C-alpha cells in the first residue's frame, strides 16, 4: 500500500486524457497514467500496477470508471490527495445529457471518504471548465455543497484567451 498521494483527474474524453498524460511525460513527469477503455489488457494492467505500487501520482479516468469495483478497490488502496474534475460544466443540466456519470462523482467521493474514514478531513476537489456561464457555475457549486457539504472557491479568468491564435488558410479544391 503506497503512502504517496494520488491525484485523481476525472475527464470525459479518452483522447484528451492520453494527450495530457503524453504532455506530462514529455515534460519529464513520469508519474501520470490513464486507465480507459481504449487500452489493451496489458496496458491496463501496467497502468493499474503503477497506481497500486505508488509509481503513479496522477491518474486520469472517466467518470464511468468510478462505477468499476476494480477502480474502487484500487483507489481505496491509495492515499487520495485531490480529485480534479475536468469539463466540470457536465454537472449542469445540459451536460447531464452528455455524461450522466458526472452526477455519480460526489456519491463516489462521499463513499470513498466514509470507507477510508477520512470524513473529518475531506479530500479536496478542484473543478475546471472554460465554458461555464454563471448559472452553470452555480450548478457546480450547489452540487458539491449538497453532495459533500463542500463550498467551492471560484477563480475566474477573462473570456479572452490571448494564448489562442487562429489562422485561416484558403485551400483550393478540385
Predicted features by range, described:
Residues 167-174:
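Conserved interdomain hinge at the start of the Helicase C-terminal
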Amino acid at each position: 500500500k503506497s503512502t504517496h498521494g494520488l491525484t485523481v483527474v476525472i475527464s470525459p474524453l479518452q483522447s484528451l486524457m492520453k494527450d495530457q498524460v503524453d504532455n506530462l511525460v514529455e515534460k519529464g513527469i513520469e508519474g501520470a497514467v490513464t486507465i480507459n477503455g481504449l487500452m489493451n489488457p496489458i496496458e491496463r494492467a501496467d497502468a493499474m500496477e503503477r497506481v497500486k505500487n505508488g509509481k503513479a501520482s496522477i491518474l486520469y479516468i472517466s467518470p464511468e470508471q468510478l462505477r468499476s469495483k476494480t477502480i474502487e478497490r484500487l483507489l481505496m488502496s491509495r492515499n487520495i490527495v485531490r480529485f480534479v474534475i475536468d469539463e466540470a460544466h457536465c454537472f449542469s443540466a445540459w451536460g447531464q445529457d452528455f455524461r450522466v456519470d458526472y452526477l455519480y462523482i460526489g456519491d463516489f467521493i462521499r463513499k470513498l471518504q466514509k470507507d477510508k474514514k477520512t470524513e473529518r478531513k475531506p479530500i479536496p476537489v478542484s473543478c475546471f471548465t472554460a465554458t461555464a456561464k454563471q448559472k452553470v457555475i452555480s450548478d457546480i457549486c450547489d452540487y458539491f455543497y449538497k453532495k459533500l457539504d463542500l463550498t467551492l472557491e471560484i477563480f475566474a479568468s477573462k473570456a479572452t484567451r490571448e494564448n489562442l491564435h487562429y489562422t485561416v488558410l484558403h485551400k483550393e479544391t478540385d
